Each structure stands twice: as structure tokens, then as C-alpha cells.
Amino acid sequence: DLARRLESSLPMQRHDFVLRFMKGRFDSRELAVAAAMSVRLDIDKPYYGMVLCPEQEQNDQPFTMQEEPLNRVTGVTVCSVEMAAMNNFLYVVFADTEQGLHDVANALHQICIERYGHACVAMSNAHQNFTHAPACYLEAATAYDNRFVMDDSSVLEYSFVSVNLRDI
């Protein structure tokens, strides 16, 4: 009975982990990895980044890695939470390569285009230091905030948005 209750609380524990990670509540990589392992997430990968994707009326849950084409992306661990106040979903992507981050963001973009006819998917730069998670989130949020002035035909990348902001 206890095992069943613990198992049923796993989604909430993962949600809590993602929010704590995003806010930079872990003083070291080791502490973050241990906390993630306690909720059965393997985040001990060289790169991570954050992706924001809008919530749709037809979809009030984040996409899962079992959905096509996300299920074809390898070498990544993806955790997601609803950011209710902002009306979007945050995906924290831990990856073996920087390309894995792009693959997840592009897959999310493709899903949104196919299901809703439009997509606004924004991503941070790739990071390695887990203590930089708050800055990583701000990068994704900055890219997302530029959705009104940028074309949403592809993923809005912070590196691209920040270069264009300097030109304004």
C-alpha cells in the first residue's frame, strides 16, 4: 500500500524537482542529480536547456516523450511542468549532446504545428553548470517573449533572439 502511494505521488515529486531546479535551489550538480534520481529521473548528462511551449485550449497537459516525434529523440531526459500563470509549459531537457536539446525543441514545434496549425516554441542556450538554471530559464522566457516580433515558423532560440535584440 505504501509503495502504491509513493508511486502515485511520483508526478508531483517530479513537478517539485523541476521547479526547485529551475529556481536554482541545488547548490551543486551532485545534489541535483541525487534529487532527480530519488524521483527516477536521470539528469546526469553534460548539457541541459529549457524550452517553453504555449498551453492550448485543447491541451492542458505537457506533451510526453511517448508522443511522435518526441519518441524518436534519444540521449535525453525531459521533465515538464505547467507554468499556469504564464499559460505555457516548461520542458527542462537534459541531453548527451547539444543537438539533443534542439531535437526536443524541434519535435515540440512539429507537434504544435501539426495539431494546432501554429507553434511558438522557445528555447534557451545549452548550459552545463546546474547552478545556472535560473539564467537558463530567463533565456527561454526572453526568447518566448519575442514571439510577437519574431516569425514562429521555427523554434525561437535565445541565441538568435539576443543577437537581433542588439541590432534594435
Regions found by a protein language model. Give the residues of each.
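Extended Gly/Ser/Thr-rich low-complexity repeat segments
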Residues: 102-114
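Conserved short beta-strand edge segments in small beta-sheet-based binding/regulatory domains
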Residues: 113-125
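Interdomain helical linkers/hinges and coiled-coil/dimerization scaffolds
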Residues: 1-104, 123-148, 152-168
